[in-house]
């Protein structure tokens, strides 16, 4: 039996962490939000905040031991995972598990697990630890290729390379965009896919697994731009995706929501990546489902029932991006963005802006995917990120 409230310590306080915090507080929980800088989005609504380098094992261990939370919920990839493993051995609950956090923070570890251990279909790939190794690794894959740091987020350091001459620049971009200390990249074949999807997969305490309706999405440079739900898959494609998601999440273990990404190429479903936490493409569930991905994550984490997941006929999201470097920000055009029925705007509360930084998201629902995608696009286009304070 679950007794509330619980104390939750959140590692990472971005826009996804903010929604986790809000969902947790609606269940009466006490939330401690951690990040590398003060005033991060989740800190603005949390009960307590801590600023620290979460890659520093000693600092991370000290904070967790000081607060003694019931649950530690990672919201980002760049963490001192060895410290989490030690704390888990001491009895601290890490969501979904310390091992899952460690495996998924590096593209090489999750790709090896999927491709070699679980025999899931993935793009053809290789690894390289230098620009010279990258040249040798890329040639057999054919052109173009995609080069990514083994550790990064939101598309940082990713390049599509059309010929050997572009590989050195791709290596430099990958190293500049890499997180952590691994001077290594994954290079993979460029897939001419029909669709990218995220399958939100929820593991519960009793061992059962639930799936949300698949979410289609588009990226630029590996960074999410828009998403829609439900994505149109054949019965066989959905069956394949659910089977693969079940296989890999069962291997990782623990409880909570996982964002499992796939490419659809003809009749093939190809595994791409996995996040052991709510996914940015899943922001659409804030308007599309009776229980958002954040509420589903918390229910699984807190061992609460999920009787049913209801989905709207059609829903979509479109990110709101900054264009300039701004030390203080305001938003213009909110009234126009909210003038259409079944439209919502989320402004994340980030303290500053830079070109192409994700500052918010527009959400829309309705009866057809074409209509709601257009509606979300219009709402997002109405918002301007400008210098100043407040909302006008």
Swiss-Prot record:
In this chain, Mg(2+) is annotated as bound at 261, 273
A single GO molecular function term of this UniProt record: phosphoribosylglycinamide formyltransferase activity
- Catalysed reaction equations from the record: N(1)-(5-phospho-beta-D-ribosyl)glycinamide + formate + ATP = N(2)-formyl-N(1)-(5-phospho-beta-D-ribosyl)glycinamide + ADP + phosphate + H(+)
GO BP terms: namely: 'de novo' IMP biosynthetic process
Under Enzyme Commission nomenclature, its number is: 6.3.1.21
Q: Which residues bind ATP?
A: 107, 148, 153-158, 188-191, 196
Indicate which residues the UniProt annotation says bind N(1)-(5-phospho-beta-D-ribosyl)glycinamide: 15-16, 75, 280, 350, 357-358
Q: Does the keyword section mention Metal-binding? A: yes
Q: Span of the secretion signal? A: none
Going by the UniProt record, its keywords in alphabetical order are: ATP-binding, Ligase, Magnesium, Metal-binding, Nucleotide-binding, Purine biosynthesis
Pathway assigned in UniProt: Purine metabolism; IMP biosynthesis via de novo pathway; N(2)-formyl-N(1)-(5-phospho-D-ribosyl)glycinamide from N(1)-(5-phospho-D-ribosyl)glycinamide (formate route): step 1/1
| PROSITE patterns named among the record's database cross-references | ATP_GRASP (PS50975)
Give the ATP-grasp domain ranges.
112-302
List the record's Gene Ontology CC terms alphabetically.
cytosol
PANTHER family associated with the record: FORMATE-DEPENDENT PHOSPHORIBOSYLGLYCINAMIDE FORMYLTRANSFERASE (PTHR43055:SF1)
Q: What does this protein do?
A: Involved in the de novo purine biosynthesis. Catalyzes the transfer of formate to 5-phospho-ribosyl-glycinamide (GAR), producing 5-phospho-ribosyl-N-formylglycinamide (FGAR). Formate is provided by PurU via hydrolysis of 10-formyl-tetrahydrofolate.
Q: Which family does it belong to?
A: Belongs to the PurK/PurT family.
Subunit info here reads: Homodimer.
Q: Spell out the protein name for this chain.
A: Formate-dependent phosphoribosylglycinamide formyltransferase
Q: Which organism is it from?
A: Prochlorococcus marinus (strain MIT 9303)
